[in-house]
Amino acid sequence: MDVAHPEEVTRFSPDILMEKFNVSEACFLPPPISIQLILQLTWLDIGVFAALTAMTVLTIAIYLEIVCYLMDKVKCPIKRKTLMWNSAAPTVIAITSCLGLWVPRAIMFVDMAAAMYFGVGFYLMLLIIVQGYGGEEAMLQHLATHTIRISTGPCCCCCPCLPHIHLTRQKYKIFVLGAFQVAFLRPALFLLGVVLWTNGLYDPDDWSSTSIFLWLNLFLGVSTILGLWPVNVLFRHSKVLMADQKLTCKFALFQAILILSSLQNSIIGTLAGAGHIGCAPPYSARTRGQQMNNQLLIIEMFFVGILTRISYRKRDDRPGHRHVGEVQQIVRECDQPAIADQQADHSSISHI
């Protein structure tokens, strides 16, 4: 007797699955609207939703406390704004996840909004490092006599033979472009996805080789890797110098948010698409996977928000930007003791 291979088995239509196998109709329907969801919630579901909403509110309260602290303790307005925008990432993701929890049909759009905001975080993280030196001019002046190792992850860690470089202004512009392209391409590609979705061409359930959804996500993955590389290069060179500014903690939280908001969503979506996450009325398998991801993100961002509060509570009176003349004046002031010592040595030798 011939045995049919898995790829030869004909998929049953939804009507046959509902009639012959008693599969719920909700497994083939779009996500429920909010009022339908609320009417179908059990007391246990209401308790879970209320607890997750309360955690979101606490995450917002933690961020507001961070803002008040930064307004009072960070004197430079440029550095203060950068820290405030970057520390808001866990709060924004928690809010969008909570909205997706209560409005299941908006999950795709709130996920896009969170991803677009975090795309700006690549550029903000680069600015935090640059402003930690005192601005672009101060950083270039400091790194003029240093070499930087560029064979770092995530795209060049397998190339240890790459030479160390001096960070010139032209190379710094390439670093800025690498981080900024994520902030530009993510909103542009997500907007393109929404336009294609209205025409039925953007389907998150379609993982075939001809799927526009698959190719857009692959392009976003490459863009993310290229955007993370310049930030990682500068971080590895600056983490010891900026240890008092808790740069390592800030960068670790940045990477944690990147993994939790991107990789976790992809893993759960793949499991749901492969049938490892079953449907549970009123949710289909895909919607249930998205709800699971939102619930996990709310809990995770609550704890990330607490760690963010610890990492960003640092009094800072140093400027985040200096003009060229100010940098040259600081360099001259730093060189004056060395020049005085050299003159003293010459005078002592002449007396001898």
From Swiss-Prot:
Glycosylation sites: N22
Keywords: Cell membrane, Endoplasmic reticulum, Glycoprotein, Lipid transport, Membrane, Transmembrane, Transmembrane helix, Transport
Compartments (UniProt record): Cell membrane; Endoplasmic reticulum membrane
Principal localisation: membrane
Extracellular side: 1-45, 104-108, 195-210, 272-294
Catalytic activity field: taurocholate(out) = taurocholate(in); prostaglandin E2(out) = prostaglandin E2(in); estrone 3-sulfate(out) = estrone 3-sulfate(in); dehydroepiandrosterone 3-sulfate(out) = dehydroepiandrosterone 3-sulfate(in)
Superkingdom: Eukaryota
Chain segments annotated as transmembrane: 46-66, 83-103, 109-129, 174-194, 211-231, 251-271, 295-312
Gene Ontology CC terms: endoplasmic reticulum membrane; membrane; plasma membrane; protein-containing complex
Membrane-protein topology: Multi-pass membrane protein
SMART domains xrefs: Solute_trans_a
Annotated GO MF terms: protein heterodimerization activity; protein homodimerization activity
Subunit structure: Interacts with slc51b. The Ost-alpha/Ost-beta complex is a heterodimer composed of alpha (slc51a) and beta (slc51b) subunit.
Protein's recorded name: Organic solute transporter subunit alpha
Organism: Leucoraja erinaceus (Little skate)
Gene encoding the protein: slc51a
